[in-house]
Amino acid sequence: MGSVNESCDNYVEIFNKINYFFRDDQVINGTEYSPKEFGYFITFAYMLIILFGAIGNFLTIIVVILNPAMRTTRNFFILNLALSDFFVCIVTAPTTLYTVLYMFWPFSRTLCKIAGSLQGFNIFLSTFSIASIAVDRYVLIIFPTKRERQQNLSFCFFIMIWVISLILAVPLLQASDLTPVFVEPSCDLALYICHEQNEIWEKMIISKGTYTLAVLITQYAFPLFSLVFAYSRIAHRMKLRFANRNQNVTTNTNTSQRRRSVVERQRRTHLLLVCVVAVFAVAWLPLNVFHIFNTFELVNSFSVTTFSICHCLAMCSACLNPLIYAFFNHNFRIEFMHLFDRVGLRSLRVVIFGEQESLKKSMRTEFRSRGGCKTVTTAEPATFQRMNESMILSAMEQDEQL
């Protein structure tokens, strides 16, 4: 009996020694491990992503849900993005962090399958939501007076991104499974690895290579193309509008200060559009390239260190999206300040948004209370369309529609 217990203790000791990926011993039984310091670094990075990403997306969700005026078709896509990014931060990031830090899976087979597919679903939904926001903004410019058409297209976009996300997540649900590494019934010890099994992929209708390429196209290439196309067209419309305004300013007022204001606003708006595209492209490219190299065995072995860096960079997108689509949005900033005031965090509001933004918020609230916002309801169709487009572009200039 003593020898059995001693053997079990040895098994547990070996298990504890090889389970953690980041350690001082670089190679154990042919398995390469990463330095312990890198384990601390990657854990800290994931914790920051989880914390700030969850808070930023949660605030965005709360603002839209609690304020009826914010429940517009355009903000509906931002809400959808915030929901998907929130679950990326509280589900995908922690689960991946655990699989990066530890070799063996301590949970059930069902949780292994759910974790694999849910991680993919959240990522697909997040990136498709980003593309839908860009396309929705583009449609808003092309059909400024066709509100019913805009709503129908937006509804179609919403249904489409959920359906495609679910379809792309199904193969991950099938392929993810447990692989037994060590089973010792006498010690009640069983070690399993949760991963996508090549044997299951070979039995499926779609191969792993085909699936990886399909994900590269649908999750990265197509959304990136949508962002570049939509925002380049929007930027072109804005450029024409800025040129006309600058010409009018020069002709009528000849005021260099106002010209500089027009140029600065154009530069700031274009910079924001470029940032939207750049953040998506830079954040998701390394992870997609890694999956291509790993799937087609262009590298000798799977590197946990390389994967964790690529995945951590992709997760940064979930943190930056609330900044790009909400905190840089004028209407959202106003509502965030209202929210901070409502929960008694006025000092924090001033720290985050500054005195100038707080003053603008007070002036806007007073302006609304006096009935300063009016809507033009009668005009010739062509004139009304130009006015609508002009108002939309003006809103975008103030970062209200991105």
Swiss-Prot record:
Give the Cytoplasmic membrane side ranges: 67-85, 144-152, 232-272, 329-402
Q: Which cysteines are joined by disulfide bonds?
A: C112-C194
Record keywords, A-Z: Cell membrane, Disulfide bond, G-protein coupled receptor, Glycoprotein, Membrane, Receptor, Transducer, Transmembrane, Transmembrane helix
Instruction: Give me the glycosylation sites of this protein.
Output: N5, N29
Mode of membrane association = Multi-pass membrane protein
- In the record, what terms sit under GO molecular function? neuropeptide Y receptor activity
Q: Which GO terms describe its cellular component?
A: plasma membrane
* Residues on Extracellular side: 1-45, 107-122, 174-210, 294-306
- Please tell me whether the keyword Transmembrane is annotated for this protein: yes
Transmembrane ranges? 46-66, 86-106, 123-143, 153-173, 211-231, 273-293, 307-328
Instruction: List where in the cell it is found.
Output: Cell membrane
> Which family does the similarity line name?
Belongs to the G-protein coupled receptor 1 family.
Q: What is this protein called?
A: Putative neuropeptide Y receptor 11
